Amino acid sequence: MTASASRTVAALFALALAATPAVAQVGKPVTVKDANTIAEAEIAALPYMNVEIAKALVAARPFPNATAFDAFLEGKLSKEQRAELYAKLWVHIDLNSASREEIALIPGMGPRMIREFLEYRPYASMAVFRREIGKYVNAKEVGRLERFLRFP
């Protein structure tokens, strides 16, 4: 391939990449499925889930919050199993109105981070959340936490 052809291919690739819309948006995670919208078959394929639980979950929807979702799963999965599942299936919590109990359900949350989440509310934007929580954890962890949130 000539240098001119290489530049043309590179330019076309860059143009195509720039024209491709972003798939993930704030509060719309790529890897954490929404328990209120995920298909029954997808639920059944998740860790610790089966067809029976998937059918019951779909019948119980919509879950108004993460606490209600956790209560639904409580008799079906152990606390450890639920924590592992929540990394893949979740009811996104409202950043400004979630209860302490809801925030505590986010995998990996401890008392300090719960306190920090609550201290800076209300958040005017997701950028404010990133800035404030970024004082306590690195950008990768802020991004991980964002997967469980929605901004009103």
Model-predicted regions and their roles:
Residues 10-20:
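Bacterial N-terminal signal peptides
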Residues 65-66, 124-126:
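Short, charged, surface-exposed loops that flank catalytic or proteolytic processing sites
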Residues 18-105, 114, 144, 150-152:
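Long, highly charged, low-complexity intrinsically disordered interaction regions
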Residues 69-73, 128-133:
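Short, tandemly repeated low-complexity microdomains enriched for cysteine and small residues
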Residues 111, 115-121, 127, 141-152:
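A basic, often C-terminal nucleic-acid-binding module that engages the phosphate backbone, implemented
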Residues 132-140:
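Short, exposed beta-strand-loop hairpins at the edges of beta-sheets
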Residues 1-12:
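Bacterial N-terminal signal peptides that target proteins for export
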